[in-house]
């Protein structure tokens, strides 16, 4: 039986969390089995075409790197939850795994924001030259700034996340130990605002402007925009899907959970209901590590063509070998 103790003010609650033993290992296993090869392929494809890097593919490379680093930590979490929250890997590893999760989460959000701004400039300001003058050099500097901001935002995870003891078993707390919930609250809310709400607002502003241009009559749109229309629409759809599945539900339930667990007078059933809602959305926040490579596939024509060529070649070889086997 998986149980968690929670203390808030005068309340001392014990949560029943058997669902984590099934849901979390299942989702994390899917993310690991799909995310590891998909992101490795994206990085490999970009590396092979490194002489023809564009600003978008540079952002995609950094996005795939963040995803790949995160999915490599998932076997530890899969083991943890299949063993009823038992964490045998030590306090530093606990902190580092939680740090990887939030670094990937907010890094993905910021790199998707950069990609959206890049696409916005191409659609709404196709003749502007200021963002093209330094080209790839400026893009690499932006990526370095994103990594710096994300690491700085997530470093307090090493302070708050830690191991603890529940029912004589070592566990790894995600946000903070229950007795530090009040001190974690300001940081958790600040991280949500700076790491999710502000980038999300920027993405919405870009997409609203892009939608206005894309919905204009054909004769009012330049030829350069015509060529980018389908690509932009695909990107908008996929980014909206990523936010709908991975980012928005997680941050909504996390914010509510932070508020209720800092309230000393709420009854235990209410605390448990919000804890379950938050912990059910947490594994789906990892799904962006699978969805991000799909974004790359549908927005990069050369990658689609090379992938189809590889699949056709493999299929032809299989049919050839199959015919030889039966022919003999």
UniProtKB/Swiss-Prot annotation:
It comes from Meleagris gallopavo (Wild turkey). The keyword Cell membrane applies. One of its GO terms (molecular function) is G protein-coupled UTP receptor activity. Keywords: Cell membrane, Disulfide bond, G-protein coupled receptor, Glycoprotein, Membrane, Receptor, Transducer, Transmembrane, Transmembrane helix. GO terms for cellular component: plasma membrane. Receptor for extracellular UDP > ADP = UTP. The activity of this receptor is mediated by G proteins which activate a phosphatidylinositol-calcium second messenger system. Disulfide bonds join 94-172. It is found in: Cell membrane. The chain crosses the membrane at residues 23-43, 58-78, 97-117, 140-160, 190-210, 232-252, 276-298. It is a multi-pass membrane protein. Belongs to the G-protein coupled receptor 1 family. This is P2Y purinoceptor 3. Coiled coil: none annotated. GO terms for biological process: cellular response to pyrimidine ribonucleotide; phospholipase C-activating G protein-coupled receptor signaling pathway.
């Amino acid at each position: 039986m998986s149980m968690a103790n929670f203390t808030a003010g005068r309340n001392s609650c014990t949560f029943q969390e058997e669902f984590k033993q099934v849901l979390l290992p299942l989702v994390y296993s899917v993310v690991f089995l799909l995310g590891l090869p998909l992101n490795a392929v994206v990085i490999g494809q970009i590396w092979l075409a490194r002489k023809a890097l564009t600003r978008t593919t540079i952002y995609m490379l950094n996005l795939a790197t963040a995803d790949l680093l995160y999915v490599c930590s998932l076997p530890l979490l899969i083991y943890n939850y299949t063993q009823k929250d038992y964490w045998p890997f030590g306090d530093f590893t606990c902190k580092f795994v939680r740090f990887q999760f939030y670094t990937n989460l907010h890094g993905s959000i910021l790199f998707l924001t950069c990609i959206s701004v890049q696409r916005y400039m191409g659609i709404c300001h196709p003749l502007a030259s200021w963002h093209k003058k330094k080209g790839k050099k400026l893009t690499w500097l932006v990526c370095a700034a994103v990594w710096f901001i994300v690491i700085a935002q997530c470093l307090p995870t090493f302070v708050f996340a830690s191991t603890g003891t529940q029912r004589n078993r070592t566990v790894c707390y995600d946000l903070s130990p229950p007795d530090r919930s009040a001190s974690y609250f300001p940081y958790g809310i600040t991280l949500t605002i700076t790491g999710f709400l502000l980038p999300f607002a920027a993405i919405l502003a870009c997409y609203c402007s892009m939608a206005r241009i894309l919905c204009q009559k054909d004769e009012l749109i330049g030829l350069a925009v015509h060529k980018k229309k389908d690509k932009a629409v695909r990107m908008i759809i996929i980014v909206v899907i990523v936010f709908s599945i991975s980012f928005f539900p997680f941050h909504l339930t996390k914010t509510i959970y932070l508020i209720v667990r800092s309230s000393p007078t709420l009854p235990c059933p209410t605390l448990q209901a919000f804890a379950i809602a938050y912990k059910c959305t947490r594994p789906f926040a990892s799904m962006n590590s699978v969805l991000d490579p799909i974004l790359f596939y549908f927005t990069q024509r050369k990658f689609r063509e090379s992938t189809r060529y590889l699949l056709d070649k493999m299929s032809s070889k299989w049919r050839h070998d199959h015919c030889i086997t039966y022919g003999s």
